[in-house]
Design a protein with these regions (language model features):
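Nucleic-acid substrate recognition interfaces
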Residues: 1-243
Length: 243
């Protein structure tokens, strides 16, 4: 709605609308027309408007694509809320998270953190799972200085090979899930659209994609952390790598 408002004002008056104007429009006008907006955390609305403003500025300054209208049918949905007066809390003993406008909910907590909470981003992925990412402000610890330098060559058989001969192989377990993915996609093509079995198979595909993504993400993080921790200078190829 605020994107449509911004576009309408520009087309009619050739006038730029600031993120503050959009936020005021949401509070003064939209909340009158859409009562359910009053039930939503105010920081979530403000952050959504500010994110829209960033996309709008990139469109003009960096020639990025024009901001798109979001749909409730999108596979990925998220919102960000800010910390104030203890409105965000994580209890590791009970395994619960407290968020603004919500009661404490049970969650699988991966690891404890140190530092002051700044914000929380709640997201729902295509598999239907919900995730909460907590942003905290903490003291920066510099890595120990080392005299070792390294070069990295991206491979085909291996993920990459370093100049000292160490090879980081591509994960074989991913092939297992990729085979499952092909099988599920083949099954989906034989299901009647909008049938129960169609949506069940579609969810299995989403879960398989998620599994592959998480395994790959975790592995890349471990590899990059190892390389960064052990070397002072890192040199790599400047290639356009797809996928």
């Amino acid at each position: 709605q605020t994107l449509a408002y911004r576009k309408e004002i520009y087309e009619k008056e050739k006038k730029s609308v600031s993120k503050t104007d959009c936020n005021n429009y949401c509070n003064r006008e939209l909340k009158k027309d859409y009562e359910w907006l009053k039930e939503i955390d105010k920081f979530a609305l403000t952050n959504a408007i500010y994110n829209m403003d960033v996309a709008y500025q990139k469109f003009f300054k960096e020639h990025a694509g024009y901001p798109k209208f979001k749909s409730k049918h999108d596979n990925y949905k998220s919102y960000t809320t800010n910390f104030t007066n203890g409105n965000i809390a994580v209890d590791f003993e009970t395994g619960k998270i407290k968020l603004p406008k919500l009661k404490a909910v049970k969650a699988r907590l991966h690891r404890e953190y140190s530092g002051q909470i700044k914000s929380a981003t709640v997201s729902q992925v295509s598999s239907g799972k919900y995730y909460v990412s907590i942003l905290v402000e903490t003291e920066h610890k510099e890595l120990a200085h080392t005299n070792h330098n390294i070069g990295i060559d991206l491979g085909i058989k291996d993920l990459c090979i370093t100049s000292d001969g160490k090879a980081y192989e591509n994960l074989k377990i991913i092939k297992k899930y990729e085979k499952q993915l092909v099988k599920l996609q083949r099954q989906l093509s034989h299901k009647g659209k909008r049938s129960k079995n169609y949506y069940k198979t579609k969810k299995k595909i989403a879960l398989c994609h998620e599994k592959i993504r998480n395994i790959r993400k975790d592995y890349l993080h471990k590899v990059s952390h190892e390389i960064i921790s052990e070397n002072q200078v890192i040199v790599s190829e400047n290639l356009q790598i797809k996928n």
